[in-house]
Every structure is written in C-alpha cells, then in structure tokens.
Amino acid sequence: MTHALCACCVALLAAPSACGCDGIPGSDAGRDSGSVVPMGAPSAQALLDEVAGCAGVEIKGGFGLDGAGSVSMFACGSAVYWNADMDVDCDGIPTPPCDTDPAGQPQTSIVDLAPMGDVDPTLLPYFVIPLGTPESPWYATHGIELGQVGAVIYDGQVHYGIFADEAGGWFIGEASYAMCQLFLGPPTGGSDPCSPIDGGIDPSAITYVTFTGAPNRATGNEIYDHARHVEIGVDAANAWLAER
C-alpha cells in the first residue's frame, strides 16, 4: 500500500525533525534512540516487581509459544502485561535483512494510521499482539489501540516501543527486528542474533507491559518517532508505579 508523504516532510526530507517527522520510513532517523533511556525512568526491576505484586485480572488466555506452554494476558491498573518469548517480526517496509524473512508481510497493521506510509521493522522498535480466533481486535475493550506504547523488559533492560502489528491466530511473543536489536545488539562475526529466520529470545523470558488509554498512544507522525515513544512510555510507567 502506498501513502503520500506529509507536505511538510516532502519539503524538509533532509531534516525531518524540523516538522516532527523523525524516523521517516527508510531513513536512519531514530535507529539508536531507544538505547538511551532518560533520567527518572523506572528500572527493569521496579517494573517486574510491580507485575509480581499486582493481583492482575486475566483478560485473555490460551495464547501459545513456539515451545510448550500457554500464556495469558492480565490487566493491572492502567497496564496490560504478559510473559512470552520474542520472535522477530519483519512486517512492513522490506529492508535488509527483513527482506529475507519467508514469513514477512508487506505491511503492518498500523499502516492505515501512519500518514507517511508503513513503518520499517529494522528502524522502529514495535511489538505485536495476536488477534486469536475468530480474528478480532479484542484488545480494544481493554484500552489498547494500535499505536499504544509499551515497555519490553528482559535481562535487566527496559526498552519502549509501540503496538504496531497484529498476528493472526494464537501465537504470542513477537517484536520488530529493531526491538530485538536493542536487547541483543547488531550482527557480529557473520551471526545475527536477531535474524528473522532463527533469531530472537527464548520462550517466556520477556515481560511485555502495554500502557492503556489515549494519553499513552502514539498517533499521526508520532508513530515514527521512537524518542517520543520513550517519553510517553517513561511517563506512563512512572504513573503506573504510582497507582499502588
């Protein structure tokens, strides 16, 4: 699907930040922005402690992992959380190495909301929520929409991203190539830990926390702006921790 660039960014393509269009699809804008979390951001342990101490209400169960096991999603105040693995999602603009993904799709679910065209999975950290069967946006009744900001927690690290893609069926635990790279780093010695074919992170090692409600959602040109996602996510995470 082809979308026209916003008029501002056509004129300022060489300096997209001048019109609030950081992270233009196909550019290198924002590639490393998620690796720097601002001062005052909650730690990974603080978020995990909140998950552990919350009497979460199950909102959807029966999701599967690549390996054995069943996963449920829980609501806790202004957040929804789940534990899963991280398979690498390469849907969206097919730039290398995502153009080699045999399961890759030419667009993400957020494409129709993205004013400058689809997102690039090698540039934008995002995560995926499955639709179940029959497929439906069941998550909307729990304050989640495409563009919602969330925290992804693994190995003492927290990185923020948006909900940008849906998965058909019941398998859970996917995030973009860019999100995987924030945790595992770039290819080294000819080996890519985030290869869309056999990379990613082992089952159940990841905690995903999605912050609900309109204030915690990226819309319009914000969809491409990972620095903005971090800002929204840090504020939402601190507010969530203050609820109890």
Regions found by a protein language model. Give the residues of each.
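Cell wall/extracellular polymer interaction/catalysis modules
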Residues: 36-161, 167-170, 183-187, 195, ...
